[in-house]
Swiss-Prot record:
A Gene Ontology term for the protein's cellular component: endoplasmic reticulum membrane
Biased composition (Low complexity): 326-338
Protein name: SWI5-dependent HO expression protein 3
UniProt source species: Saccharomyces cerevisiae (strain RM11-1a)
UniProt keyword annotations, A-Z: Coiled coil, Endoplasmic reticulum, Membrane, mRNA transport, Phosphoprotein, RNA-binding, Transport
Any one GO molecular function term: RNA binding
Entry coiled-coil feature ranges: 68-197
Length: 425
């Protein structure tokens, strides 16, 4: 704005001086040069002055043109300055906008840095949790391995119990078959006696009573066997439910120690080698036992069904057959009475002939004889199964005398053979 004021003032100053100068040129004495011939000497001075004036006018014209050019240049510079000022204002506005955008970007950057720090903290926390979970996975794998070993020990004990149960079942089934044979022989004998000699009502009633007692004894044996099976099944299920007990591991270890000591005493080097191989190949034995668990449970159920079917045997009943004696034959009456007394008080000829099996004990028909069965209480059986480390105090069922030793020896043989086969597999 100051430059514009300067240009206006300079133009206003030049305008009147220019007009005066032009008027002086019009009234110049050079026009009267011919008329003023009076003073020739002074005319030269005047001419020289006029020449100087002409030079000055020329220089003045040049200066005016230069001033006009300068004024035009000044106007152009002023217009450029105004444009530059406008551009400067625009650039200032843009700078302010850019500063605001820059501040916003800085705020966003700070927020992103905060988010990054939070995410890094979360990542570190998740990494720590991942490490903890990996440690837990390793511990769980170790626990799983220990549980698999416990399962193996439980399977071995279950196999031993199953074998003992099968041995007892076979033994009692043999005894029942022998008793059934004996009952059939007695029926044949009594039927022959009734057909040949006839029988009195009193002797028939006594024989029926004896047979009823015998049937009761058979029923008692069956009930004891079923009770034994139920207790064994309860013990097995209870032991299978409690797989995480240390007592089964100790029991298995004591059994292995007993086998090794027995083999050392009997100088059985093959058994010792197989036992060592079994201990070294414990993982393979675990896998094979896991495969055999389901088949063993199914065989146990099948054995239970077969035992239930064997219990459906009907009791024996005495058929009353009477032969009318001949009243005329006195000798026949005497013989029949003697035979009645002999058949009631003494052994029958069929029994005295030695046709009875050797395993059956010679007992009178009226005498009731049952196998001695140990009936442990529920609390004692549970403590023996769960908290007793000694295998000798585990709940057992005794067999009749004379058969205990053979059953235990065969059980030991089968158990040793089972250990040997398990080591080989």
């Amino acid at each position: 704005m100051s430059d514009q004021d300067n240009t206006q003032t300079s133009s206003s100053k030049l305008a009147p001086h220019h007009n005066i100068f032009m008027a002086n040129l019009e009234s110049s004495p050079t026009k009267d040069r011919n008329t003023s011939s009076q003073n020739a000497s002074s005319s030269r001075v005047i001419e020289s002055l006029h020449d100087q004036i002409d030079m000055l006018t020329k220089t003045n014209l040049q200066l005016t043109t230069q001033s006009q050019n300068l004024l035009s240049k000044l106007e152009l510079a002023q217009s450029k300055e105004s444009k530059l000022l406008e551009n400067l204002n625009l650039l200032k506005n843009e700078n302010e906008n850019l500063n605001s955008i820059f501040e916003r970007k800085n705020k966003k950057l700070k927020e992103l840095e905060k988010d990054y720090s939070e995410l890094s903290n979360r990542y570190n926390e998740q990494k720590e949790k991942m490490d903890q979970l990996s440690k837990l996975a390793k511990n769980s794998s170790a626990i799983e391995q220990s549980c698999s070993e416990k399962l193996q020990n439980m399977e071995v004990n279950y196999n031993s119990l199953l074998e003992s149960q099968n041995l007892y079942r076979d033994h009692y089934s043999d005894e029942i078959s022998k008793l059934n044979e004996k009952i059939g022989l007695l029926e044949l004998e009594l039927s022959n006696q009734n057909l040949n000699y006839g029988s009195d009502t009193s002797s028939n009633s006594d024989i029926e009573l004896n047979l009823n007692k015998f049937n009761d004894s058979v029923k008692d044996l069956k009930s004891l066997e079923t009770e034994k099976d139920s207790k064994l099944s309860k013990i097995i299920t209870h032991s299978l439910d409690e797989l995480n007990l240390q007592s089964w591991l100790n029991l298995y270890q004591t059994n292995e120690n007993l086998i090794s000591t027995f083999a050392e005493k009997m100088d059985l080097k093959d058994v010792l080698k197989r036992n060592d191989e079994k201990i070294s190949n414990k993982g393979a034995v675990v896998q094979t036992l896991k495969k055999n668990v389901q088949t063993q449970v199914e065989s146990n159920n099948a054995d239970a069904l077969s035992s239930n079917n064997a219990q459906d045997m009907l009791p024996i009943k005495m058929v009353k057959l009477r032969k009318t004696p001949n009243t005329n034959d006195s000798s026949s009456n005497g013989n029949s009475s003697n035979n009645k007394r002999r058949s009631f008080y003494t052994a029958s000829p069929l029994l005295s002939s030695g046709s009875i099996p050797k395993s059956a004990s010679p007992v009178l028909p009226g005498v009731k004889r049952t196998a001695s069965v140990r009936k442990p209480s529920s609390s004692s059986s549970k403590t023996n199964v769960t908290h007793n480390n000694d295998p000798s105090t585990s709940p057992t069922i005794s067999v009749p005398p004379g058969v205990t030793r053979t059953v235990s020896s065969t059980h030991k043989k089968k158990r040793n053979s089972m250990v040997v086969h398990g080591a080989q597999s």
